Amino acid sequence: MRAFDRSRAKRGEHWTGPQMSRQQFARDSFGIFAAQIAVMALGIGTSVITARTLGPSGRGLLQLLTIFPATMSNFAKLGIPVANVYCIRRRGARTSAVASNSLLLGLGLGTALALACWLGRGWLLHTVLRGVPAVTLPLVLVLLPFVVLQTFFLGILQAEQRFQEYNFQQIAPTLFGLVGMAVALLWLRAGLIGAVIVQTAVVALVTVWLVLRVHRRTPLRLAWDGPLAKEMLGFGGKSYVQTLAATLHRQIDQYMINVFLDPAQVGLYAVAVNLTNVLLKIPDATGTVLYPRLAALEEGDAHRATARVCRNTLFITAALGVGCLLFGPFGIRVLYGPRFAGAIRPMLLMLPGIVMMALYMILTRNFTSRNRQGVNIVAAGVALSVNVGLNCVLIPRWGISGAAISTAVSYSLAALMLLVVFVRESGHSVAETVLVGREEIGGYVRHARGLVPGAAGE
């Protein structure tokens, strides 16, 4: 049986321009956004528990141990998650073959990465993980194969547009994490070690569930498909540098704060980052649904869809950003207490960059869907370099506020670089891409009135 069946697209299994359903797109996006809102609410609950029980320093150490597996796993992903979507949606590859290759690659790459980190544990514990108890490192390294596998198989769910399962996989670890942290920190008083054990157990269990769900519909085989692997690695290799640079761009500031300052400052900064990143749930939700659809569209249709999604996503994100600006300081004081008041200024300083990142997250999907990852790589690489350079200057001078300024500048730069290229290649103007029209605003007003009892009939 062939790994590739390019006739699938011709039989209508792909999402084409004339068949494009805006209602279905809206439903899928809303479903993922609703799941992200649930994740946000549960995540804030977990964040409050960990912050109030561990304090700024302990919260900072937990933040480093939480983001470390996600950061390191990007060195081993090789672009496979986006390659899975591309191969299934555009190339017509059999899902079972893609999943089987992903299983073998994920286990092999994740295990090799864990061993490499263990061998370099001395350097890690004296630099980016400075202050982290050595006993917690094995618990975190065990997670690496699971984290790699999870991202590979999420790409398969995304390609098959199995968004209900995708949403459950997003919500489940946050829900289990909230319950686990409450038990470990509030009841058992297990401290940082208990929190890390909960994190490891939750990620491992959810990953096993995800693999079994994929296996149920598309049986996995311990067989290696060489030609398909070459296709996956070939496309993924182009996305690898892009994904790695983008992830480092988002997370390297927290490691640099730990190097230049101390874990307590990481804890304060983590609160600011986690609250502002709530805004990015919107472009993440729409981008997750948009990418597999763009991968099956002709270029002109893809550009039109991208411009429409960009301007609406940017509008909603900016509106919520204003809400964060007005009520965020009050929320930090009430939820986290006076010990975390130092998170307020960096939260406000990074907000403009967070809004611009919404634009970046949508535009990257357009370039990746057209096999133009080189544009994303340049933007992410330049922005990462600017971010690191600014952090080296501003963190020693202005502390975590300097890191927030660096984030705002580099995020905005990355988004503007992609916008310039998109406008040039698509023929859409800047206004068409970033500004909602009068009819679209009218639609938002009608929807808002529909949510208010008695307003719909006025």
Where in this protein do the model-derived segments appear?
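Signature of the first transmembrane helix
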Residues: 2-5, 23-81, 110, 114-118, ...
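Membrane-interface junctions at transmembrane-helix termini in multi-pass inner-membrane proteins
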Residues: 87-90, 146-170, 296, 352-379
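Helix-loop junctions and terminal segments of transmembrane helices
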Residues: 74-93, 159, 272, 276-300, ...
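Hydrophobic alpha-helical transmembrane segments
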Residues: 134, 138, 167-216, 382-386, ...
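Interfacial segments at transmembrane-helix termini and the short loops linking adjacent helices
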Residues: 17, 57, 121-140, 326-355
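Membrane-water interface segments that mark the loop-to-transmembrane alpha-helix transition
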Residues: 27-40, 64-65, 74-122, 135-138, ...
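Interhelical loop/hinge segments that connect adjacent transmembrane helices in multipass membrane
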Residues: 7-22, 164, 188, 192-196, ...
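Transmembrane helical elements of multi-pass membrane transporters/channels
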Residues: 27-44, 173, 177, 195-210, ...
